[in-house]
UniProtKB/Swiss-Prot annotation:
<feature type="disulfide bond" description="Interchain (between B and A chains)">
    <location>
        <begin position="41"/>
        <end position="110"/>
    </location>
</feature>
<dbReference type="GO" id="GO:0090729">
    <property type="term" value="F:toxin activity"/>
</dbReference>
<feature type="propeptide" description="C peptide">
    <location>
        <begin position="59"/>
        <end position="92"/>
    </location>
</feature>
<keyword id="KW-0313">Glucose metabolism</keyword>
<dbReference type="GO" id="GO:0005576">
    <property type="term" value="C:extracellular region"/>
</dbReference>
<dbReference type="GO" id="GO:0005179">
    <property type="term" value="F:hormone activity"/>
</dbReference>
<feature type="disulfide bond" description="Interchain (between B and A chains)">
    <location>
        <begin position="53"/>
        <end position="123"/>
    </location>
</feature>
<keyword id="KW-0800">Toxin</keyword>
<feature type="disulfide bond">
    <location>
        <begin position="29"/>
        <end position="107"/>
    </location>
</feature>
<keyword id="KW-0119">Carbohydrate metabolism</keyword>
<keyword id="KW-0301">Gamma-carboxyglutamic acid</keyword>
<dbReference type="InterPro" id="IPR016724">
    <property type="entry name" value="Insulin-rel_pep"/>
</dbReference>
<dbReference type="InterPro" id="IPR036438">
    <property type="entry name" value="Insulin-like_sf"/>
</dbReference>
<comment type="subunit">
    <text>Heterodimer of A and B chains; disulfide-linked.</text>
</comment>
<protein>
    <recommendedName>
        <fullName>Con-Ins M1</fullName>
    </recommendedName>
</protein>
<dbReference type="Pfam" id="PF00049">
    <property type="entry name" value="Insulin"/>
</dbReference>
<feature type="modified residue" description="4-carboxyglutamate; partial">
    <location>
        <position position="118"/>
    </location>
</feature>
């Protein structure tokens, strides 16, 4: 390879790194990083994510009606289904390079503090009611 080819490869590598850093917007966590004081962890995270996803789906004309479920306990089967979806998604992402690099909902929303918008990025796709 010529010098210009090496330069092009290095420049392309740096460009990819900068783009990922700038536009990724995700936090990177270490395994020993403490939880953020305002982060949501464990069952609080699951409950909050479920609430955010229902509101997001209702706002976009989906099948869930957030107003109907506000103020009362959700059915146990619905809660179990949502939690098992989170577990499946976590297991599926364990092998992904992003997960190994310390990214994901626990990193973004427990180890760090994330916004409602960042929470809704982890919601399943909204289904249109028809």
């Amino acid at each position: 390879m010529t010098t210009s080819s090496y330069f092009l490869l290095v420049a392309l590598g740096l460009l990819l790194y900068v783009c990922q850093s700038s536009f990724g917007g995700e936090h990177v966590c270490g395994s020993n990083q403490p939880n953020h004081p305002n982060g949501k962890c464990g069952s609080k995270m699951a409950d909050y994510l479920e609430e955010q996803c229902e509101e997001e789906e209702a706002a976009h004309g989906g099948t869930n009606d957030a107003r109907a479920t506000t103020g009362r306990a959700l059915s146990l089967s619905k809660r179990r289904g949502f939690l098992s979806m989170l577990k499946r998604r976590g297991k599926r992402n364990e092998a992904s390079p992003l997960q190994r690099a310390g990214r994901g909902i626990v990193c973004e929303c427990c180890k760090n503090h994330c916004t409602d918008e960042e929470f809704t990025e982890y919601c399943p796709h909204v289904t249109e009611s028809g």
